[in-house]
Swiss-Prot record:
Coiled-coil residue spans: none
Subunit and interaction comment: Part of the 50S ribosomal subunit; part of the 5S rRNA/L5/L18/L25 subcomplex. Contacts the 5S rRNA and the P site tRNA. Forms a bridge to the 30S subunit in the 70S ribosome.
A biological process term (GO) from this entry: translation
Protein name: Large ribosomal subunit protein uL5
Length: 181
């Protein structure tokens, strides 16, 4: 799984520096962290569902997840401030590269009817968000042992200044973006 990080430093780094005419190596965009988030959905009041979410996140990422809580109360969703909602994991350094390699080489190919990642999922600052509707695309989650199929969000935070730099970085790393029609 170290190959992705090696690929970045040996090939992608130089290509990005040449493509954008960066003067300093510190200007070249890099991935700084990956945030993986999963919610219990309408079962957020169920303590077992929250524990299952935290367990699934720990299995997928290899790092302990922590609970996320509601910031505001929303009566329509029967939600109170401070109520547990799901879990979140922030990955950096080697665990980040290992997880990204797993997403690229294992999870994305297992997605049904995959037509490419949307280039519109950038936030304007070079960060990319991608969602999986089913967590069973990861090999650590077995269909037999889960109570409910849940989705998860993966946010890739980069040091890019804009979406073009972030897009080029992820494209050169091998992320399969959908072609513009």
């Amino acid at each position: 799984m170290i190959e992705l990080e090696k690929h970045y430093y040996e090939k992608v780094f130089g290509q990005l520096k040449a493509h954008f005419n960066f003067k300093s190596p510190s200007q070249v965009p890099k991935i700084t962290k990956v945030v993986v988030n999963m919610t219990a959905g309408n079962q957020s009041s169920n303590a077992k569902a929250i524990e299952a979410v935290l367990e699934d996140l720990a299995k997928i990422t290899g790092q302990k997840a922590y609970k996320t809580v509601a910031k505001k109360s929303l009566a329509t969703w029967k939600l109170r401030q401070g109520m547990p909602m799901g879990g979140k994991v922030t990955l950096r350094r080697q665990q980040m590269w290992n997880f990204l390699a797993k997403v690229l080489h294992i999870a994305i190919p297992r997605v049904r009817d995959f037509r490419g990642l949307s280039p519109k999922s950038f936030d304007g600052n070079g960060n990319f968000a991608l969602g999986f509707k089913e967590s069973i695309v990861f090999p650590e989650i077995t269909f037999d042992k889960i109570s409910k199929i849940r989705g998860l969000d993966v946010i890739i935070v980069t040091s890019a200044k804009n979406d073009q730099e972030g897009f080029k970085l992820l494209e050169l790393l091998g992320f399969p973006f959908a072609k513009k029609v």
